[in-house]
UniProtKB/Swiss-Prot annotation:
PANTHER family: ALDO/KETO REDUCTASE. It catalyses: a primary alcohol + NADP(+) = an aldehyde + NADPH + H(+); S-nitroso-CoA + NADPH + H(+) = sulfinamide-CoA + NADP(+); S-nitrosoglutathione + NADPH + H(+) = S-(hydroxysulfenamide)glutathione + NADP(+). Its EC number is 1.1.1.2, 1.6.-.-. The gene is AKR1A1. Gene3D superfamilies: NADP-dependent oxidoreductase domain. This is Aldo-keto reductase family 1 member A1. Its main location: cytoplasm. It comes from the Eukaryota. NADP(+) binds at residues 13-24, 47, 164-165, 213, 215, 217, 265-268, 271, 274-275. The keyword Methyltransferase does not apply.
């Protein structure tokens, strides 16, 4: 079944498929085949970012599969990318998007997100660091970056724009100056970080929420030895047995029923296909609440740095760091 049938509408009428292919941590050598396979089995939503350093390979897949006389029409595909932290200066925004478009071999994006609210030093080094290993920050106001992003919509380079990793206060701050409203907020979200308040905040303001790491990001580099493993959660495994589905499919179904878009990453064909097969069953209201009640406010994705031999949150020193607020 194609995920193309199962979507939510953005405030501007665009339709975003509820399941997309995530590409963070997908190796350049593998990502082209993963995207081609995903498109062949019915995916119509691909989530990308300049900072993942694999957009050119994704572009090769698009070139083979998408466009006039190809299997998929461009207008049937939803492509997201993200503006990186080193490109927040208003003058850098359009060139950054044009580079992404050239890499992806596309004329426009369906959605362009500001990847984080905080900026790094301008330049082409994705992770500019001081000699002691800490990040070199820039203090461009994200509202100025937003105003530059609005021009991309006027120019037809992006159909919609949005935010990633912003907290509720920062979202309202952007809304206070926006002439083009953010259409989407993309954040980490899964039963251990259910984000109920943030989702309600967004839905009230007309933003659709996309969940990254919806399966708890089992392949991260920095792992805490004591962290809970979402795919091993007994309640989830029990539901998987009941519906003859995998624990991953239960997690994705839970989000789809909440009208939350998910972008599970995989380069394995069997998993790519399985992640799409969540539209042939439903969880009961009781089961939905049970999965939601597993929340522990456990954030798996906090970028870390090693400073003086100790792991520390990479961006906590920036005034716009989003994770100090309750939500």
């Amino acid at each position: 079944m194609s995920a193309g049938c199962d979507f939510v509408a953005l405030y501007n009428g665009q339709k975003i498929p509820l399941i997309g292919l995530g590409t963070w941590k997908s190796e350049p050598g593998q990502v082209k085949e993963a995207v081609k396979y995903a498109l062949s089995v019915g995916y119509r939503h691909v989530d990308c970012a300049a900072a993942y350093s694999n957009e050119a390979e994704i572009g090769d897949a698009f070139q083979e599969c998408v466009g006039p006389n190809k299997v998929i029409k461009r207008e049937d595909l939803f492509v997201t990318s993200k503006l990186w932290n080193t490109k927040h200066h208003p003058e850098d925004v359009e060139p950054a998007l044009r580079k992404t478009l050239a890499d992806l071999k596309l004329d426009y994006l369906d959605l362009y997100l500001m990847h984080w609210p905080h900026a790094f030093e301008r330049g082409d080094n994705l992770f500019p660091k001081n000699p002691d290993g800490t990040m070199r920050y820039d203090y461009t106001d994200y509202k100025d970056t937003w105003k530059a992003m609005e021009k991309l919509v006027e120019k037809g380079l992006a159909k919609a724009i949005g935010l990633s990793n912003f907290n509720s206060r920062q979202i309202d701050d952007v809304l206070s100056v926006a002439t083009v409203k953010p259409a989407v907020l993309q954040v980490e979200c899964h039963p251990y970080l259910a984000q109920n308040e943030l989702i309600a905040h967004c839905q009230k303001r007309g933003l659709v929420v996309t969940a990254y790491s919806p399966l708890g990001s089992p392949d991260r580099m920095w792992k805490h030895p004591d962290e809970p493993v979402l795919l091993e959660e007994p309640g989830i495994k029990k539901l998987a047995e009941k519906y003859k589905k995998s624990p991953a499919q239960i997690l994705l179904r839970w989000q789809a029923q909440r009208k939350v878009v998910t972008i599970p990453k995989s380069v394995t064909p069997a998993r790519i296909l399985q992640n799409l097969q969540v539209f042939d069953f439903s969880l009961t209201e009781e089961e939905m609440s049970h999965v939601g009640s597993l929340n522990k406010n456990w954030r798996y994705i906090v970028p870390m740095l090693t400073v003086n031999g100790k792991p520390v949150p990479r961006d906590a020193g920036h005034p716009n760091y989003p994770f100090n607020d309750p939500y």
